[in-house]
Amino acid sequence: KKHGITTIRNFDALNDLRNLSYSGERIAAAGLHHQIVITMMDLPPGCEGAHSPDDYSKMLRNILDSDIPFHSVCFKDSSGTVHPRKIYETIKAARKTVPEDMILHLHTHDTAGIGISQYLAAIDAGISRIDLAMSPVSGGTAQPDILTMWHAMKGTDFTLDIDPLKYIKVEEVFEEAMSDYFIPPESRMVSPLIPFSPMPGGALTANTM
């Protein structure tokens, strides 16, 4: 907190609430914003069972019924594979479940190329916040680009309160600043095969460096 951190996003890859209890208590005790996470993914073809909107709704109700102190909820699609309809149904149900003023956040990666459509579905369902990135480190295993999202929202009832021309200038400066760093080509890749073996974007980047 003394170094400027205000929020900690707290997640367990298997959605085991027991693994979020003590860490959540410590985050709140330190006076930080505790954003508790429900991990999402789409199952590969031929797999059935977990990771349905009903599963996520059950997880959310378990969180609300627990004694874990938290301030907001993030739905985290680490592999970027959840199809937009599932996103919509999950967020729509969550919005009806949590208090009206509670922040619902969606985090995804653009590894499968559907990040923008996921966010549009989430916005229609009532999401509060989404995570975006800035070129040259947007897209692929990172988050969708902020300018692309701004463009995709044209003609809808929503927009991003940004000046796109200023962002273009900022991205030019950022690209120059990043020119001395190696960016693995795999980290910029969009692959149609990701939904067949969902791997988190961060894990994919780390394992190819």
Tell where the protein language model's regions lie, with residue ranges:
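Catalytic cores and adjacent flexible loops of soluble metabolic enzymes
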Residues: 1-9, 13-209
